[in-house]
């Protein structure tokens, strides 16, 4: 769908790249105030997981999450689809099934027509329909910049919850979507994106991570998270810190969007990349400039990052193949050693 309005001109950030940096977020969330503890809350924010999980009895957990951001593309319908797909992904990343969503909309009503906002909502509704859920309501405010996202509710068998803090030594790492979304969308804004690469990032961002529901059945997947605004290294460092392991990443094996290296060489690097490295670069071993700029690239609606025990690798690859995805191990986890960085990157 084409539009005369370029939504990205009305926002200072783009997609998950407009997230508050991990370093600043740590300051915001740190509190000396005594926390209210609820024994039924199985997953909270202690390990920066993708969603909260609450035990409602009978072996069932309710998953609750929210995600919203400013436009990463100009087309309002695509913006709505991408934002909704990204929000729903958190449910899949926990191994859950989404059941309902409500919309979050901020709109500069003095700058952008309400008809454009309607197209954004329609895009969000389309993504919800593809996920098999209803967009049941929402809340809107007059805001200086366009913002859209969802609060999503899901369900999960509490014995099958996948967390980012339970990875085991010896697990192999897999990523279900290629990296470079931030790079390609930046290239498009700069007018440098080649015609043959038009739409690739949008297609990737709009692909639901439904296979997370199937991965929930695999006991050998010891940790799972989705890769979004903090980049691959940021989310992998959360797995390592929460699980007490360290990782070795093989850069050549990491899936990448077409020609992403050449776009990086042309300066198509979003601002979030530097903020990410500033926040967790001290946890990473030596890298080349190319490795740093791609592995810290903020992803919007990125893929699932899995830690898989060797005996479950064939089953995981078969599940992915049923969803049209060929998986290759991109690294492995080992025992965390004192004084060592959490992640080593090699060629």
From Swiss-Prot:
Its EC number is 2.7.9.3. The keyword Hydrolase does not apply. One of its GO terms (molecular function) is magnesium ion binding. The keyword NADP does not apply. One of its GO terms (cellular component) is cytoplasm. The record marks 19 as: Important for catalytic activity. Keywords: ATP-binding, Kinase, Magnesium, Metal-binding, Nucleotide-binding, Selenium, Transferase. GO terms for biological process: selenocysteine biosynthetic process. It is an enzyme of class 2 (transferase). Disulfide bonds: none annotated. InterPro entries: PurM-like_C_dom, PurM-like_C_sf, PurM-like_N, PurM-like_N_sf, SelD_I, SPS/SelD. Mg(2+) binds at residues 50, 90, 226. ATP binds at residues 19, 47-49, 67, 90, 138-140. Binds 1 Mg(2+) ion per monomer. Synthesizes selenophosphate from selenide and ATP. This is Selenide, water dikinase. The gene is selD.
